[in-house]
């Protein structure tokens, strides 16, 4: 059982280790924190913390550094102090959505890089699932004899448009009718939808045209649902270079794999969550991931993560994510 004094010493060692990047000795701890105890007392408490697996001792230094268990205990204390009060939330994402003309991909890309600049670590932002971002309206516009423009408007206000190559001759009224048909039906590909399209279409060519549009929209939705925006990867590489060069490659491979997506998709609440080292993956020991959710207008939500070394400035990152809504 850890005592309150041992917990205070552990917290001080973690913060000094993050600041200095080297093992912390008893004298340095007393000098930096003006502790009113003897070096012998501090050394004894540090030995107790080492026996409890909260600290590690290296052969090349008389000081000690936090273990993963030590970082875990430190972070758990921080999270207990964190309050998720909406009154301090910053509606930055909604501002970015407006600034980027309701283009969610552009807004999230800006957001990932902006958050990386503020946190000084790498960030990952996962796009909201399209199952939550429902299609509100579809419009077909004839540009010329061979090109049509497909405009998709989502309930978030996000707008996308695509150019379609088609020489099919359709009147303005018929284009409106087809647009309304697609807007008013569940366009998930199914035998039932195929029957509806067949009954609605005026010709085999029109039937094929509508089916092609439905397939294209479904393919686009499937690709977009797994979109991840990475900001500040170089910041993570720089931070890891200072501690363990050999760890960079497996970490980058992890971040570029589906495993990170699966991890982020387990986030189901607004609570901030911190995973450290092997808690993330058995092959990882040098990084931590701080995760939370973000929201657009209370209706759409996705996952966000700040990724840095285990010696991360956790308090700053937690406070930063706590302000995001």
UniProtKB/Swiss-Prot annotation:
An annotated Gene Ontology molecular function: DNA binding
Keyword Transcription regulation listed: yes
SUPFAM superfamilies: GAF domain-like, Winged helix' DNA-binding domain
Transmembrane segments annotated in the record for this chain: none
Gene Ontology terms describing biological process: negative regulation of DNA-templated transcription
Domain of life of the native organism: Bacteria
Keywords: Repressor, Stress response, Transcription, Transcription regulation
InterPro entries per the UniProt record, alphabetical: GAF-like_dom_sf, HrcA, HrcA_C, WH-like_DNA-bd_sf, WH_DNA-bd_sf, WHTH_transcript_rep_HrcA_IDD
Keyword set includes Repressor: yes
Biological role stated in the UniProt entry: Negative regulator of class I heat shock genes (grpE-dnaK-dnaJ and groELS operons). Prevents heat-shock induction of these operons.
Family, similarity comment: Belongs to the HrcA family.
Name this protein carries in UniProt: Heat-inducible transcription repressor HrcA
């Amino acid at each position: 059982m850890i005592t309150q004094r041992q917990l205070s010493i552990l917290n001080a060692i973690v913060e000094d280790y993050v600041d200095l990047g080297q093992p912390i000795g008893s004298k340095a701890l007393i000098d930096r924190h003006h502790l009113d105890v003897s070096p012998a007392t501090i050394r004894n408490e540090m030995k107790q913390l080492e026996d409890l697996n909260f600290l590690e001792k290296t052969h090349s230094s008389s000081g000690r550094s936090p273990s993963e268990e030590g970082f875990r205990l430190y972070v758990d204390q921080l999270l207990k102090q964190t309050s998720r009060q909406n009154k301090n939330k910053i509606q930055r994402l909604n501002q970015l959505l407006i600034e980027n003309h309701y283009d969610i991909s552009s807004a999230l890309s800006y957001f990932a890089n902006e958050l990386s600049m503020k946190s000084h670590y790498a960030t990952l932002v996962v796009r909201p699932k399209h199952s939550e971002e429902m299609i509100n309206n579809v419009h077909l516009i004839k540009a010329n004899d061979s090109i049509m423009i497909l405009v998709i408007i989502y309930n978030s206000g996000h707008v996308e448009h695509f150019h379609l190559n088609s020489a099919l001759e359709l009147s303005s009224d018929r284009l409106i009718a087809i647009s309304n048909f697609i807007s008013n039906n569940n366009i998930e590909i199914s035998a039932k939808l195929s029957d509806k399209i067949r009954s609605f279409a005026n010709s085999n060519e029109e039937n094929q045209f509508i089916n092609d549009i439905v397939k294209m929209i479904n393919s686009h939705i499937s690709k977009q649902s797994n979109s991840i925006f990475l900001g500040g990867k170089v910041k993570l590489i720089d931070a890891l270079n200072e501690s363990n060069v050999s760890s960079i490659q497996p970490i980058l491979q992890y971040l570029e794999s589906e495993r990170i997506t699966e991890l982020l998709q387990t986030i189901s609440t607004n609570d901030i969550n911190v995973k450290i080292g092997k808690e993330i993956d058995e092959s990882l020991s040098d990084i931590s991931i701080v995760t939370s959710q973000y929201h657009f207008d209370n209706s759409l939500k996705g996952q966000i993560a700040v990724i840095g070394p285990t010696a991360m400035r956790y308090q700053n990152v937690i406070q930063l994510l706590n302000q995001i809504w």
